């Protein structure tokens, strides 16, 4: 029998080892210790060179990973791996696969890729189980001819080999679904390839195929066919048979035509025919109704078929680099088309019908010959329109004009008409992309010249340049900018001398001017301006890195935080009538491209000859602003544009943190720095001197204007006269302080102008708190004089020196511009209200709103009209607006525009006139009473440095509070399907449905100044993320953690604050990632708008101090990505307290309760943490625990929900989800200190040695057949409450285990969940109680689980979750687990008082506890290490057998036998009738395993904590013999007194004291029978009459009386048995627990080895345990015994019920030896 006892250490039961990326040079020796259990070994990515002999003794390996090593040889011993299923030896140096691999018949997945193999062994094709074979990049030159024998292959990868042909037997692989033959040298394919009926993917790319076999058309299941990069000149017509084909890749072949049969591919979704020789595209392409992507790049197509218009699902059409001269009008029928690329063709015109493709977002027509664009394209929502190869912005501004030939209205811009691209001539030789210079060195070609291919040879260069040549510079390198600046200056001087007073040009000159304009690289520098479409070299020059005079202050990048009006409505605006500029304007235009944008400042010019008037573009948008071509704009928007919005990308006021230096010498390259700043500040503007010239020009020509101030053009574009700008000289005195003046300057003679062409010195930056700011210096002031030094016409360095040498007192004279109202304010109304539209994207203008507390309608009280003029500073205007037509109303019933917020410290705040709630009447003279919100935004974000506002203030207005008062922000609007709610960004921001709630929570603006460190906060929530416990009814982004003394904490932020905005970015509806990005933006200053939402209910911080050695005593449930801890909200990922132990610091503290939510532990926020992480944090908390908690859920309500019939309380337990329950509930009291662990390990070692001896003794004394009798000493010493019975399942309902389950093997939780160490264990005190295998029954009714209500196991045991007893009912190593059995819980008694063995004779009781120890013969016996010699063992067995038989005869002849058998027969019948039994005064409910109502697995009570699979466990079965590899079976088996045995079929109750004294077991039985006959419910009442102490005293008294009667008669036999055991112990070192073996174990019930880990655990939902259930687990008193269970590991689970077993014992039958099937009733 010793061969069945595993004598190796229990920690050697390991199933999986992962040693990847461990830099191993040899296989670790420890792995060989696991040779009997190891199933998965991963040694990938190490430096192994060889595999030693012992490695191949790991016979049970099922998965072996050795990839990415340096293994040079695979030994033939690999044949030992007969169980191997998955083998990965890819990327090694193995040159040959051994022939013996054919013996690995279990192999299903093999990867040999990346080895220098040249052939496969002959026996390789015998691996008939192989399903997935990878042989990529192994230099194979041929495949075995019999490869068809691998009939189960599903995937075959042969990429990057040297295969020239394929064997015909390949057609036998009928299960093959994926065949990859890419990157070989195949020249022809076998016809048999078409005989693979299940083939779904066929990869033949990068071969040398010149044709495809027609049989390929038989592949009816084929989904993807890739034959790109071959030599195909045609496709077979049979390709129409590929009816399931979705992807057809034909790139880089020699195809000239596609077969008409391609139209039969109805499921075709992607067709790529790029880089072929197609000259014609078949009309049948239109029949491919599911086609979404059609790539025809680089062919010879001259036209497209009209049938393309039938492709309603086509989203991407690319016909770049062909020879198209026209596009079919039917293309507009492609209603789903998103991207249309026609680059580098010969198109002269686009059809207007393209506008019908309403989903078109990107149109690329660069490199064509377009004269103009159809006017209908204005209706498209384009995001990108590419007209030139080096166009810097995706969108341009267009104007309308009449086509000279057709008279139709068309669109044009400065890039039209197009110049033909030279790449057309090189179409077949190279692509434009390849010709594009990619080098970054300074010698690269910086000029790209385009010439007309037909005429440039005949014309001289100058003529060609004037008429045809478009010379465009490539994007300059910063080092080139200085040189370019000088060139620009020369050009500017030439321009001034050439045309000083010219008023207008001839048409030829105009054309030359426009060509010259194009010559100056409008678009080559995308980064130099935020909003202009062109970028002149002088602007590029500005881009060189420079530094600012920063006075030691950190410069900050910020996007107009106070002025939160960010975007105008993204539209492209057109003026039908050209606006011609003459005179100085033309000089400006020619010399500075940005003036091309600013030309819109002129409202009307004198009438000029209109024969060839050219259009001037307006306001090209920056690609970041979501501008797109759309419907014609509202005239008010155009008014705003003409008013001053047209050049909003140039700001003098931005700051960057780069290149900071102290001292004024930083000013030298100030202009460069400022221009760079514009990249980050698209809405900070400046007024150019060019604008002044424009305005002066318009004033000079005012007599020529037919209408003063306003006019309309033919497309209803409202043209408004801009406000006048006056200049005034100011003298300011500054007292210098240490650190500088606090200003930066830009400009100067010879430097890039700061404004237009004005080469004066300008103030480009003013530090807020600096001396200059206090003296009144403002950004944009022109510096005329410093301390008497005249700076008119001075160079930059002269000004720097003047400022540097100015001393402590600086007197400077500046020229400042101010806005003057236009003479006639114009009221505008929408001319075509039907054109209202809302852009598709939500704009992020972030306008906060004030909400009146009572949401009043428009007040009719007296109004006070106020006017103010605000000067835009570096942070904008400093206020926000809300309301307007088409937007969310600021006040109910009032469509007006109101001041909704005033930024503290901003321009409006310092002006101290505007107040929150003021109604805006006009902006810069434009009436706003009936205006839309976006129109007001457009006016406010114009480039004008001053904004004149007229507002009305109601005397009783709530908004009339101090401007310092932080206005409230409304809650997010309700969901709506209306376009206003769906599309409008600004319109989203004020919803007043919840106005009363809004005022309850104050709103504050908090500014965080980054100092290089973190912000000190964490957030939770977002539109795509749960934000529990914050904002459950109103989702949003919340602060979930504030680090003490961090930046956020110092700024007053607290946990629970709702973040409404960050740097003007609205986060009310933002996703979590958007909020994170906003907070992590590269800004020095983070401005946050937060709403002080109330804290979650019950939020408090508690501090718990643990006493030395004391455990915290709580269990938790929930966590992210796991099972929800809140039974009322499945989306709640919070961490909740699921249990508070009665023994622990938490219970002593008294403030923690079940159901509470834990927000923080120490400084660690648990929000968003997984369950495992939360457990780890709690365990690492130390002796002093600081917790932030709040109310969670009501455990009483939760228990009612979970106990409801028909409700699956936990999907894991019900087998719905395969999940480890440890992820849902864990005790936090599991970590031990290293010292404690060391002590525990020593104890385990002792227990292990003892258990091995005990097993031997069990075999010696049992002889595998006879029942083992208990000696009287053991029976007398052990209290009867500690005796346990091994339950047997009834034969009629067999114990079922469907299949071995190993899922739990890899759970890190399982490895801990079953470790049960008793606290304060003192084995020395147990001398009076010989350690044995008797275990106290848990006096707790196990919680029922719905999992097993069907009475049988799930057909698929993998669907069962782990039974959670091990994880939820025990807090390991916790004192609360050692609850004394003297304290039964009053909650647990069950109304079941029944028979008690206390009335039986002692002999009968002893027979009742006899255990048959049966041998279970394994299929493949494994060698066991015997610690006892064979001779001694044989003698001991014989002696013990004689004694046992003698004792059996004596007991059979006992005088009371017949009477007891009669009583027992009655008792068995009664127990069967009532299903209950009383043992030792404890009543048990006997449940049959197979019954439909059974809710527990009736497994032996002291089996380990892993149940058979039918109990809902993913643990191992006893049949399989292989268990949870990471489970510590020592603790499972030997610390069972710690474990509640709630899985037994016996449910204890406690009968009360009877009225009359009972002194025998029979008398007690008779009394209980009487009680049952009278009133069964009395058992509960009687049980409650006695206190626990009284019950124990009564039971002890009865036991003492019953024991005394039989002690003498057994004394002799017991002594003899102990002598035999003592003899076997001689010479052996005895551990503390070696006394276990001194008496034969009275109840050697099986405590399995790890391979037979069947546990008594209830199948209870994790987290669904009733709150007190775990506390009601009672154990034997610590002083009574420290017993451990020791068993024969091969004992099968008996399949008879406890009732039948009692009958068996009474009849003295012996159960048949041998292995019993768990699938059928066990014969008796």
UniProtKB/Swiss-Prot annotation:
According to the UniProt entry, which residues carry Phosphoserine?
Answer: 1609
User: Could you tell me where the Basic and acidic residues compositional bias lies?
Assistant: 574-583, 611-620, 1295-1306, 1395-1407, 1521-1538, 1623-1632
Keywords, A to Z, come to: Cell junction, Cell membrane, Cell projection, Coiled coil, Cytoplasm, Developmental protein, Differentiation, Leucine-rich repeat, Lipoprotein, Membrane, Palmitate, Phosphoprotein, Repeat, Synapse
Question: Bias regions of kind Acidic residues — which residues?
Answer: 554-567, 584-598, 661-678, 1453-1463
Question: What ranges does the record list as Polar residues composition bias?
Answer: 1308-1329, 1346-1357, 1364-1385, 1490-1506
Which residue intervals make up region (Disordered)? 451-484, 496-620, 646-683, 955-995, 1283-1407, 1414-1433, 1449-1468, 1488-1555, 1621-1684
Which superkingdom heads the taxonomic lineage of this protein's source? Eukaryota
Q: How does it sit in the membrane?
A: Peripheral membrane protein
Alphabetical list of Pfam families matching this protein: LRR_14, LRR_8, PDZ
Q: Where is the PDZ domain?
A: 731-818, 867-955, 1005-1094, 1101-1193
GO terms for MF: protein heterodimerization activity; protein kinase binding
Q: Please state where this protein is localized.
A: Cell membrane; Cell junction; Cell junction, Adherens junction; Cell projection, Lamellipodium
Q: One GO CC term of this entry? A: plasma membrane
Q: Which residues form a coiled coil?
A: 1430-1461
Q: Give the span(s) annotated as Sufficient for targeting to adherens junction.
A: 1-821
Q: How is it modified after translation?
A: Palmitoylated.
Q: Which Gene3D superfamilies match?
A: 2.30.42.10, Ribonuclease Inhibitor (3.80.10.10)
Q: State the LRR repeat positions.
A: 11-34, 35-58, 59-81, 83-105, 107-127, 128-150, 151-174, 176-196, 197-219, 221-242, 244-265, 266-288, 289-311, 312-334, 336-357, 359-380, 382-405
Composition bias, Low complexity:
518-534, 1507-1518
On whether Nucleotide-binding is a keyword of this UniProt record, the answer is no
> What functional role does this protein have?
Scaffold protein involved in different aspects of polarized cells differentiation regulating epithelial and neuronal morphogenesis. Regulates the caudal migration of the nVII motor neurons. Required for convergent extension movements during gastrulation.
Protein's recorded name? Protein scribble homolog
What species is given as this protein's source?
Danio rerio (Zebrafish)
Q: By which gene is this protein encoded?
A: scrib
């Amino acid at each position: 029998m010793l061969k069945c006892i595993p004598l190796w250490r229990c920690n050697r039961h390991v199933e999986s080892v992962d040693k990847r990326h461990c830099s191993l040079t040899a296989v670790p020796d420890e792995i060989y210790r696991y040779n009997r259990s190891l199933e998965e070994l991963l040694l990938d990515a190490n430096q192994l060179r060889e595999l030693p002999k012992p490695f191949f003794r790991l016979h049970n390996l099922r998965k072996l990973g050795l990839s990415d090593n340096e293994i040079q040889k695979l030994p033939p011993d690999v044949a030992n791996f007969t169980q191997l299923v998955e083998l990965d030896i890819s990327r090694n140096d193995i040159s040959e696969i051994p022939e013996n691999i054919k013996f690995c018949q279990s192999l299903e997945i093999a990867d040999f890729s990346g080895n220098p193999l040249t052939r496969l062994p002959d026996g390789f094709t015998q691996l008939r189980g192989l399903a997935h074979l990878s042989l990529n990049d192994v230099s194979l030159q041929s495949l075995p001819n019999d490869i068809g024998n691998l009939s189960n292959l599903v995937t075959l990868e042969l990429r990057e080999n040297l295969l020239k042909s394929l064997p015909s037997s390949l057609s036998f692989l009928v299960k093959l679904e994926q065949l990859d033959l890419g990157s070989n040298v195949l020249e022809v394919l076998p016809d048999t390839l078409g005989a693979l009926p299940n083939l779904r993917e066929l990869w033949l790319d990068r071969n040398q195929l010149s044709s495809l076999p027609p049989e390929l058309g038989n592949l009816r299941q084929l989904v993807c066919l890739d034959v790109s990069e071959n030599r195909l000149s045609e496709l077979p017509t049979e390709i129409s048979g590929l009816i399931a084909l979705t992807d057809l890749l034909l790139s880089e072949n020699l195809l000239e035509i596609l077969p008409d049969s391609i139209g039969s591919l109805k499921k075709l979704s992607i067709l790529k025919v790029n880089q072929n020789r197609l000259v014609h595209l078949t009309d049948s392409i239109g029949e491919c109704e599911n086609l979404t992507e059609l790539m025809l790049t680089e062919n010879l197509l001259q036209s497209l078929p009209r049938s393309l218009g039938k492709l309603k699902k086509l989203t991407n059409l690319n016909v770049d680099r062909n020879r198209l001269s026209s596009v079919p009008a039917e293309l507009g029928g492609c209603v789903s088309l998103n991207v249309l690329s026609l680059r580098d063709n010969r198109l002269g015109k686009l059809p207007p019908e393209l506008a019908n493709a309403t989903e078109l977002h990107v149109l690329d027509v660069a490199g064509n010959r377009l004269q103009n664009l159809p006017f209908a394209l204005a209706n498209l929502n384009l995001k990108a329109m590419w007209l030139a190869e080096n166009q810097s912005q995706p969108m341009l501004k267009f104007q309308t004009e009449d086509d000279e030939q057709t008279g139709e209205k068309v669109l044009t811009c400065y890039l039209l008409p197009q110049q033909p691209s030279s790449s057309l001539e090189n179409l077949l030789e190279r692509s434009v992309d390849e010709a594009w210079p990619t080098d970054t060195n300074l010698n690269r070609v910086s000029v790209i010249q385009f010439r007309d291919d037909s005429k440039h040879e005949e014309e001289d260069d100058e003529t060609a340049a004037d008429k045809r040549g478009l010379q465009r510079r490539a994007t300059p390198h910063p080092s080139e900018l200085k040189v370019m600046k000088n060139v620009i200056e020369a050009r500017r001087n030439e321009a001034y001398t050439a045309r000083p007073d010219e008023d207008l040009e001839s048409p030829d000159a105009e054309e030359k001017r426009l060509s010259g304009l194009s010559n100056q690289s409008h678009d080559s520098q995308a980064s130099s301006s935020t909003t202009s479409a062109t970028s002149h070299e002088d602007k590029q020059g500005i881009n060189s890195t420079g530094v600012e005079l920063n006075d030691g202050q950190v410069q900050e990048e910020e996007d107009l935080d106070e002025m939160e009006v960010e975007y105008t409505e993204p539209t492209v605006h057109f003026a039908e009538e050209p606006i011609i500029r003459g005179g100085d304007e033309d000089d400006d235009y020619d010399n500075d491209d940005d003036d091309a944008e600013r030309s819109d400042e002129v409202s009307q010019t004198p009438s000029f000859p209109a024969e060839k008037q050219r259009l001037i573009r307006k306001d090209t948008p920056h690609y970041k602003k979501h501008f797109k071509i759309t419907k014609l704009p509202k005239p008010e928007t155009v008014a705003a544009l003409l008013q001053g919005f047209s050049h909003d990308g140039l700001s003098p006021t931005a700051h960057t943190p780069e290149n900071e230096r102290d001292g004024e010498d930083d000013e030298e390259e100030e202009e460069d720095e400022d221009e760079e700043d514009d990249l980050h500040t698209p809405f900070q503007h400046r007024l150019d001197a060019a604008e002044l010239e424009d305005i002066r020009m318009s004033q000079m020509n005012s007599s020529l204007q037919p209408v003063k101030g306003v006019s309309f053009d033919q497309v209803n574009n409202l043209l408004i006269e801009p406000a006048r700008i006056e200049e005034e000289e100011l003298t300011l005195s500054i007292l210098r302080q240490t650190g500088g003046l606090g200003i930066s300057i830009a400009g100067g003679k010879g430097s890039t102008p700061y404004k237009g062409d004005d080469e004066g010195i300008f103030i480009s930056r003013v530090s807020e708190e600096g001396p200059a700011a206090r003296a009144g210096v403002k950004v944009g002031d022109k510096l005329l004089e410093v301390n008497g030094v005249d700076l008119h016409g001075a160079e930059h360095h002269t000004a720097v020196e003047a400022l540097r040498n100015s001393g402590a007192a600086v007197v400077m004279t500046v020229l400042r511009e101010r806005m003057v109202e236009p003479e006639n304010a114009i009221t505008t109304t929408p001319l075509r209200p039907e054109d209202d539209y809302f852009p598709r994207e939500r704009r992020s203008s972030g306008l906060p709103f004030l909400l009146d507390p009572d949401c009043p309608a428009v007040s009719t009280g007296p109004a006070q009209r106020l006017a103010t003029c605000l000067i835009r500073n570096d942070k904008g205007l400093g206020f926000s607006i809300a309301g307007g037509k088409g937007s969310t109303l600021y006040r109910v019933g009032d469509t007006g525009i109101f001041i909704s917020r005033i930024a503290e410290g901003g321009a409006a705040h310092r002006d101290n006139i505007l107040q929150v709630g003021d109604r805006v009447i006009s902006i810069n003279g434009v009436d706003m009473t009936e205006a839309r919100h976006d129109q007001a935004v457009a006016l406010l974000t114009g480039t004008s440095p001053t904004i004149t506002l007229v507002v009305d203030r109601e005397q009783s207005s709530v908004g009339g509070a101090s401007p310092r008062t932080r206005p409230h922000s409304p809650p997010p609007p309700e969901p709506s399907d209306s376009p206003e709610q769906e599309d409008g960004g600004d319109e989203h921001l004020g919803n007043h449905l919840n106005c009363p709630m809004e005022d309850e929570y104050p709103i504050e603006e908090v500014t965080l100044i980054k100092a290089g460190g973190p912000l000190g906060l964490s957030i939770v929530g977002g539109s795509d993320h749960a934000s529990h416990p914050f904002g459950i009814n109103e989702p949003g982004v919340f602060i979930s953690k504030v680090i003490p003394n961090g930046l956020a904490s110092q700024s007053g932020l607290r946990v629970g604050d709702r973040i409404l905005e960050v740097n003007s970015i609205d986060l009310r509806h933002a996703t979590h990632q958007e909020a994170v990005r906003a907070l992590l933006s590269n800004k020095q200053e983070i401005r946050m708008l937060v709403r002080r939402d109330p804290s979650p209910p019950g939020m408090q911080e508690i501090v718990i101090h643990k006493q030395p050695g004391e455990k915290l005593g709580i269990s938790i449930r929930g966590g992210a990505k796991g099972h929800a801890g809140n039974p009322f909200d499945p989306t709640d990922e919070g961490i909740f307290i699921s249990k508070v132990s009665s023994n622990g610091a938490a219970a002593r503290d008294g403030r923690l309760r079940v159901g509470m939510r834990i927000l923080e532990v120490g400084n660690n926020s648990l929000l968003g943490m997984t369950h495992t992480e939360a457990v780890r944090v709690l365990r690492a908390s130390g002796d002093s625990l600081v917790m932030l908690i709040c109310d969670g859920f009501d455990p009483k309500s939760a228990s009612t929900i979970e106990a409801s019939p028909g409700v699956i309380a936990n999907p894991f337990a019900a087998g719905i989800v395969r999940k480890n329950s440890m992820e849902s509930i864990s005790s936090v009291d599991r970590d031990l200190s290293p010292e404690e662990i060391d002590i525990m390990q020593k104890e385990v070692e002792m227990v292990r040695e003892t258990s091995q001896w005990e097993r031997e003794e069990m075999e010696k004394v049992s002889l595998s057949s006879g029942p083992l009798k208990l000696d009287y000493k053991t029976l007398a010493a052990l209290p009867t409450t500690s005796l346990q019975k091994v339950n047997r399942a009834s034969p009629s309902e067999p114990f079922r285990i469907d299949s071995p389950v190993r899922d739990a093997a890899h759970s890190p939780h399982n490895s801990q969940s079953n470790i049960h160490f008793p606290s304060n264990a003192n084995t020395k005190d147990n001398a009076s109680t010989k350690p044995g295998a008797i275990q106290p029954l848990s006096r707790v009714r196990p919680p029922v689980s719905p999992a097993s209500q069907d009475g049988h196991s799930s057909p698929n045991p993998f669907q069962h979750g782990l039974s959670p007893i091990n994880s939820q009912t025990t807090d390991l190593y916790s004192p609360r687990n050692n609850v004394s059995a003297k304290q039964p819980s009053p909650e647990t008694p069950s109304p079941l008082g029944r028979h008690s063995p206390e009335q039986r004779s002692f002999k009968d009781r002893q027979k009742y506890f006899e255990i048959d120890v049966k041998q279970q013969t394994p299929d493949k016996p494994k060698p066991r290490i015997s610690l006892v010699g064979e001779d001694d063992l044989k003698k001991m067995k014989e002696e013990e057998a004689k004694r046992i038989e003698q004792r059996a005869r004596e007991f059979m002849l006992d005088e009371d036998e017949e009477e007891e058998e009669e009583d027992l027969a009655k008792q068995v019948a009664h127990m069967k009738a009532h299903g209950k039994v009383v043992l030792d005064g404890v009543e048990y409910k006997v449940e049959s395993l197979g019954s439909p109502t059974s809710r527990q697995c009736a497994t032996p009570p002291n089996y380990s904590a892993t149940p058979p699979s039918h109990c809902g466990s993913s643990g191992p079965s006893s049949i399989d013999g292989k268990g949870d590899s990471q489970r510590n079976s020592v603790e499972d088996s030997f610390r069972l007194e710690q474990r509640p045995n709630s899985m037994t079929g016996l449910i204890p109750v406690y009968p009360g004291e009877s009225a009359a004294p009972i002194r025998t077991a029979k008398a007690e039985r008779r009394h209980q029978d009487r009680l049952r006959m009278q009133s069964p419910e009395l058992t509960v009442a009687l049980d409650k009459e006695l206190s626990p102490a009284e019950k124990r005293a009564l039971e002890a008294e009865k036991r003492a009386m019953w024991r005394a009667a039989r002690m003498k008669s057994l004394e002799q036999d017991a002594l003899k048995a102990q002598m035999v055991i003592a003899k076997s112990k001689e010479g052996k070192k005895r551990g503390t627990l070696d006394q276990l073996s001194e008496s034969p174990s009275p109840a050697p019930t099986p405590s399995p080895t790890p391979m037979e880990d069947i546990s008594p655990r209830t199948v209870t939902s994790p987290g669904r345990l009733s709150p007190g259930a775990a506390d009601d687990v009672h154990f034997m008193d610590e002083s009574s015994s420290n017993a451990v269970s020791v068993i024969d590991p091969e004992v099968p689970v008996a399949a008879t019920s406890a009732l039948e077993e009692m009958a068996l014992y009474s009849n003295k039958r012996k159960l048949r030896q041998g292995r019993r099937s768990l699938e059928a009733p066990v014969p008796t």
